């Protein structure tokens, strides 16, 4: 959500950064059931306590956590998997994530992206199964100042799979845009 929020803030002239980075960002409308008449039902379902509790309870199974991780296209180490499981088993966290997804509407952002002037780096895990890598190509067509770096073998959680590599890319992009980055 961070990249979409930052892009929106740039477009609304709330901020004027010299560089933006999107990590497997959901900048375009998500596929699936997004019909406007169904969205109030989706929002109602995710706003209550029962769905987050049910989801968190299902994540009590290590096998279910592994299935969820597999759907991201990412392969976390044992510690990363443990931390992901801990978060997934917390109703407050799952509730917040479900609420965010239930309220996600990037149609206005998609219409405005051609006006984005900040240099945008789209970092894409080639194995991402949540936000398909091809979405970055669509964003690049809309945003003249965008470029894509695709990372083979990494999924939606690329920042957790290869944090040092992601950090290097962010720093390199910032420096390329004249941002002073401490060594």
Which residues are covered by each model-predicted region?
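Glycine-rich nucleophile elbow surrounding the catalytic serine of serine-hydrolase chemistry
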Residues: 1-8
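Flexible "cap/lid" loop of the alpha/beta hydrolase fold
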Residues: 8-11, 15-49
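Active-site acidic short loop of glycosyltransferases
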Residues: 15, 117-118, 144-145
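Catalytic active-site module of serine/aspartate enzymes centered on a nucleophile-bearing elbow/loop
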Residues: 144-183
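A conserved amphipathic alpha-helix that caps or lines the catalytic cleft of carbohydrate-
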Residues: 9-10, 140, 170
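Short beta-strand/loop motif that positions the catalytic acidic residue
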Residues: 116, 122-124, 128
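Conserved alpha/beta-hydrolase "acid-adjacent" motif
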Residues: 129-135
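Conserved alpha/beta-hydrolase catalytic His-Asp/Glu region
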Residues: 31-36, 53-115
């Amino acid at each position: 959500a961070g990249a979409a929020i930052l892009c929106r803030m740039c477009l609304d002239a709330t901020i004027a950064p010299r560089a933006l980075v999107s990590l497997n960002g959901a900048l375009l409308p998500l596929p699936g059931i997004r019909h406007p008449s169904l969205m109030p039902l989706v929002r109602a379902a995710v706003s209550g306590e029962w769905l987050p509790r049910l989801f968190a309870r299902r994540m009590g199974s290590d096998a279910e956590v592994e299935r969820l991780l597999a759907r991201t296209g990412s392969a976390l180490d044992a510690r990363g998997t443990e931390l992901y499981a801990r978060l997934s088993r917390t109703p407050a966290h799952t509730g917040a994530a479900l609420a965010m997804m239930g309220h996600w509407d990037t149609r206005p952002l998609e219409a405005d992206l051609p006006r984005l002037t900040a240099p945008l780096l789209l970092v894409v895990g080639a194995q991402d199964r949540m936000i398909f890598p091809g979405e970055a190509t669509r964003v690049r067509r809309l945003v003249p100042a965008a470029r894509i770096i695709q990372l083979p073998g990494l999924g939606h959680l690329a920042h957790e799979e290869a944090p040092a590599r992601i950090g290097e890319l962010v720093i390199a992009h910032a420096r390329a845009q004249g941002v002073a980055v401490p060594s």
